[in-house]
Amino acid sequence: SIDFGGESGSVDQAALFSDAQVVARHTGERFDFESRATVGYTWDMSGGDDNPDNETRIYDLYMDLNDQSLGVSTRLGRQTLRNQGVLGRFDGGIVSWQVAPSYRLNVLAGLPVYNPNETVETSRTFYGFSVDALNLLDLIDVNVFMNIQEVDDVNDREAAGAEIRYFGGNRALIASVDYDFGYSELNSVAALGDRTFANSLTVKGRFDWRNAPYLTPENALTG
């Protein structure tokens, strides 16, 4: 029960929650293929409404094709990404081209998805690109990105940034920065590192500063 200023009430719920994941993979001489579906369903069993609150959730639903001969890979569908300037789940695609053993170009575009029970929402769009420099000096991976997001044809986010990963045997460091050049504001700076000493003692450190939520007109309108 819930008490509001001396008045109490109760909320009852009877529902069945279920989630499932299906993955299909194929590895060939030239092409590698993967498809993944992660979905959920809520069955409202309260029986007190002619229109029950049944809910379908689609967390991931995508296909991934990699051409080893050309060094090109493509992923299409609903997917989740938290780098390259992408802030989470979206409906869209990523195309990556391994232009050299240590360098990869990525182009991506899509429709941001804020809740897995959403259908395709066309009022929000984003597009961007990034460059990966891999295994530099056998120690460092670097990703540099630019990402533009629009809501109802209004610029919502104009971001550029980078992520650096360093692995040096007994030490590691991951650092990232996200800067919105539309607002001339820093959105986030984060770093995570650890060091293991000869006596097996491990020291870890973390720094995380960010705007919460990120500066966007849509976030401002929703409070």
Where are these regions (language model features)?
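Gram-negative and organellar
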Residues: S1-G223
